[in-house]
Amino acid sequence: MEQTWRWYGPNDPVSLADVRQAGATGVVTALHHIPNGEVWSVEEILKRKAIIEDAGLVWSVVESVPIHEDIKTHTGNYEQWIANYQQTLRNLAQCGIRTVCYNFMPVLDWTRTDLEYVLPDGSKALRFDQIEFAAFEMHILKRPGAEADYTEEEIAQAAERFATMSDEDKARLTRNIIAGLPGAEEGYTLDQFRKHLELYKDIDKAKLRENFAVFLKAIIPVAEEVGVRMAVHPDDPPRPILGLPRIVSTIEDMQWMVDTVNSMANGFTMCTGSYGVRADNDLVDMIKQFGPRIYFTHLRSTMREDNPKTFHEAAHLNGDVDMYEVVKAIVEEEHRRKAEGKEDLIPMRPDHGHQMLDDLKKKTNPGYSAIGRLKGLAEVRGVELAIQRAFFSR
């Protein structure tokens, strides 16, 4: 696997020198300063690429070229936003950048309720608490009909939890959910958030898939033409939330994508930390079935708790993800490609890491502190080395 590292640009507290010292050779980044929907110019792409290469690294993957909400709702100026997206892909290809990670999550990108969940060893992790999320949705957001998405027990627990929250607790929970986590291109006030949810009131799973199909049928032929590989990122968490449909959550969703536009440019990001939240997702089977279309991997683990919809981000080699079997399946896919004469490695990043050691004293992007990711990258690197030596050395 190609070892990569997500970098949020010149303002990232983790420098490119840090990235190189961590042992990564590739950078995963995006032009976050360009508004959603606008074309990424060749000039801006080359400017960022030069910064990365001057640090002795390569720009391996774009994560992400964000999709304008008008495309997802099939309203407003969506045709122009699609045309802009097509041009951005052409410009990236012209600059030699050919792997693009993206997602089709409506309104919210990835979300968590707790950004400083303290683990037994004193390090901090990200956590999604189903009951806290229910308390936010029913008692802070006050979304009409939200109760239908929860069990009677969860409704009672959420009311009890809300009753014990201070004003600061409520404000922090709201910020965590709607203000935008790293990589999310949109942040909202509560009123803005309600208005955006309202735009989806008539959009169910079938309709969102229909809108996604319009996007894919416009984008994938361009990607194919210019040699770009599109790698969709799964929903996080991988299930409907806030009354919003989610359509990249299961192996059935992956198959739907392939059936909708059967092109090798139409591929996947295997994010084990997102897909792995669901107990019914067999990660190894997903890799084996769709291996030729996996162009990027995020390798981290999560741990489901007593309420199976509550989870926290575990250490990379712990939790519910069998990292050994996952890495073995990815390495096997790389060797299959090599036998076909394809030498390209699959870019891998350790995704998130725990806030630990000296990073506990620093301001860091949630999930993206340096030391926790350094640890995760080293651990996954070791797993891969052992697998390569045990099964593929000649």
Swiss-Prot record:
One of its GO terms (molecular function) is manganese ion binding. Is inhibited by high concentrations of Fe(2+) (> 2 mM), and by EDTA or other iron chelators in vitro. NCBIfam families: PRK03906.1 (NF003027), uxuA (TIGR00695). Its cofactor is Fe(2+); Mn(2+). InterPro entries: Man_deHydtase (IPR004628), Xyl_isomerase-like_sf (IPR036237). Belongs to the mannonate dehydratase family. One of its GO terms (biological process) is D-glucuronate catabolic process. It comes from Escherichia coli (strain K12). Induction: By fructuronate. Its expression is subjected to catabolite repression by glucose. Pfam families: UxuA (PF03786). This is Mannonate dehydratase. Optimum pH is about 7.5. The activity at pH 6.5 and 8.6 is only about 20% of the maximal achievable activity at optimum pH.
